[in-house]
């Protein structure tokens, strides 16, 4: 399936939650009413979603949030299932370790899509080496930086300024002046994505 290129606010409306696909420069609540589905008439009241429907919707929500397609998402799940510990939490830890997500968390991109573009356009280095693979999995202690020739991009400066206002997650350390940061650790489950019910995804793939 091809990557979705349509209106981002429509996806957040469909899922009934902010998927953080738009920059925080403008509140996404101003762009979309989360209490109604896309379409002329919105959500039909009185309809009960099946267990399978809930599981599928949760998977779709997480895929869209992190910008991952089905084939790769399935591979992440299989890897998460092989690891020790909770499969659902492991899945989210893998997603959080993607380079495009770490670039976003550090504030170099205002959205994951923008961060993915920075990686793809070779604007990002890992431990001093250029890496242009958004799905590259960052390890604890890795240093992520914006390449010197890309530091003057207005969008990066604006994203960093915004990130400083909103707050940088505790599991990354960022030097905004140098446009570089360190991936200190994989975050604890209670440190992020409180609105994700990963157990529904595990149930779906365990059918």
UniProtKB/Swiss-Prot annotation:
Residues 97-160 form the S4 RNA-binding domain. PROSITE patterns: RIBOSOMAL_S4, S4. GO terms for biological process: ribosomal small subunit biogenesis; translation. The keyword rRNA-binding applies. Residues 42-52 have a biased composition (Polar residues). Residues 29-54 are annotated as: Disordered. Residues 29-38 have a biased composition (Basic and acidic residues). It holds the Pfam family S4. GO terms for molecular function: rRNA binding; structural constituent of ribosome. SUPFAM superfamilies: Alpha-L RNA-binding motif. Keywords: Ribonucleoprotein, Ribosomal protein, RNA-binding, rRNA-binding. GO terms for cellular component: small ribosomal subunit. The keyword Signal does not apply. Belongs to the universal ribosomal protein uS4 family. This is Small ribosomal subunit protein uS4. It comes from Variovorax paradoxus (strain S110).
């Amino acid at each position: 399936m091809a990557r979705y290129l349509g209106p981002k606010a429509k996806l957040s409306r469909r899922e009934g939650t902010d998927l953080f696909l738009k920059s925080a420069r403008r509140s996404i609540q101003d762009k979309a009413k989360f209490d109604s589905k896309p379409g002329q008439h919105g959500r039909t009241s009185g309809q009960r979603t099946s267990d399978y429907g809930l599981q599928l919707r949760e998977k779709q929500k997480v895929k869209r949030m992190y910008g991952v397609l089905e084939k790769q998402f399935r591979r992440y799940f299989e890897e998460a299932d092989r690891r020790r510990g909770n499969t659902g939490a492991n899945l989210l830890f893998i997603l959080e370790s993607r380079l495009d997500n770490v670039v976003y968390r550090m504030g170099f991109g205002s959205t994951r899509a923008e961060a993915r573009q920075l990686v793809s356009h070779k604007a990002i280095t890992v431990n001093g080496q250029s890496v242009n693979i958004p799905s590259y999995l960052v390890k604890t202690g890795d240093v992520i930086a914006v390449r010197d020739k890309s530091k003057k991009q207005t969008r990066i400066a604006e994203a960093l300024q915004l990130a400083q206002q909103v707050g940088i997650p505790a599991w990354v350390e960022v030097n905004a002046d140098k446009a570089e940061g360190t991936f200190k650790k994989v975050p604890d489950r209670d440190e992020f994505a409180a609105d994700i019910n990963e157990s529904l995804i595990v149930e779906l793939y365990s059918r």
